[in-house]
Amino acid sequence: MITYTSDIAKITEENLQGFFVGWAKPLSPNQHFEHLAKCAYFVAALENEKVVGFVTALSDGVGCAFIPLIEVLPEYQKQGIGTTLMQKMLEFLKHINAIDLMCDEEVQGFYERFGMKKMNGMGIRKAR
């Protein structure tokens, strides 16, 4: 059974395996843990103690938030976990006026289901 948590005490580096596959510069489990711990908000999907998905948000807690990462392990995709992660994150952010994220064109439809709209933006991306 999949459970969801925002309690960093329930996450360890050991149960953050298998993420960032295909990235040129993937985060190590240590870096991943540090990212979760330092984000303003995070939600992790757990099967037993194993993290099978997560979403994070950076925010000033008042007017704006940015969702830099959402990922579900390949073997757990197409089970509604990503949808639940986004729903839970957007619930955390419901008091925020501007919520942004960047994504590839092929997944824009996923985010449109949550009321997000395509916008123009700028950024720097180092090799991932």
Residue ranges and their predicted role:
Residues H95-R128:
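Conserved active-site alpha-helix within GNAT-family acetyltransferase domains
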Residues H35-V55:
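Conserved beta-hairpin
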Residues I8, P68, M102-C103:
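Small/polar loops that bind or transfer phosphate-bearing groups
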Residues Y76, G80-L85:
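Conserved acetyl-CoA pyrophosphate-binding loop and the N-cap/start of the following alpha-helix
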Residues M1-N30, M122-R125:
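Short amphipathic alpha-helix that is part of the acyltransferase structural core
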Residues S59-I67, Q77:
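A conserved beta-turn-beta hairpin within the catalytic core of GNAT-like acetyltransferases
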